[in-house]
Amino acid sequence: MPGSKIVYMGNVDRDEDGLNLATATDEQIRHIRGNEISMIFQEPMSSLNPVITVGDQIMENILTHEEVSKEEAKQRAVELLAEVGISRPEKVVDNYPFQLSGGMCQRVMIAMALSCHPKLLIADEPTTALDVTIQAQILSLMNKLKNETGTSIMLITHDLGVVAQVADNVNVMYAGKVVETAPVEELFSNPKHPYTVGLMNSMPSLAEEGKRLNTIEGSVPNPLYLPKGCYFADRCPYVTDRCKEGQPTDTKIKSRHHVWCFKVEEEMKQEG
């Protein structure tokens, strides 16, 4: 079986000492994982161990990275559950995941991820399995934690509504490649890449009730057999021969707005 870490290309460097996480040893990664970098997974019910109490699962991360007693770690677990909005945390800390709702399990995952005050929190579709009411509460909680603790959040989502509510800066990816990056307000008001425009046009609108939703024709290319040209070419309404022959390069729209698209590149040349 392959190892748990496979790096195909590129570096992931830590600012303070330049440590490349892509080539770091297992011991170095163990110190960073759950401590400096934490993650909230998409399915809380399947990410938590069903035969271990939620308190013990939070305590495990604290005891791994900090020199504290079990009593201190349990008190921290209770405090963390309270911080993420769980009522009666002193009782819930001894509950098993199956005794909690999906929303409460997601809050437990957030408490666990924040237990060692990480610098970076990776949230992979953190609200997908939740109803809209709980989703709004979780997003509000993430915004609160971001503002109060200074933790950076890398949010992975397909929901543009979630992006608008939480993100400061957005990278739009297609077939594993960034095609547009911009501050969130700029991206929503001035999308440039045809894929980004297609995503925006596919959003349902309350002002146009009953209107059929727009879709992007075609399907994502097989990641094992990616085309040599633009990955979006086969689905793009503006495709040209050039798009199928090579990869587009970075086109600067504004200081923090960049697009990888031949069409946009030509438009900027004409304007400029």
Where is each model-derived feature located?
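ABC ATPase NBD coupling module
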Residues: 7, 14-38, 64, 186-191, ...
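Conserved ABC ATPase "signature" region
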Residues: 11, 16, 72-91, 200
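ABC-type ATPase nucleotide-binding domains, specifically the catalytic core motifs of the NBD
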Residues: 17-19, 23-29, 56-72, 82-87, ...
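Short catalytic/signature loops enriched in Gly
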Residues: 18, 87-90, 181-272
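Conserved ABC ATPase signature
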Residues: 95-100, 104
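A short, proline-enriched helix->beta-strand linker immediately N-terminal to the Walker B motif
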Residues: 115-119
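P-loop NTP-binding/switch modules centered on Walker-like glycine-rich loops
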Residues: 122-126, 130-211
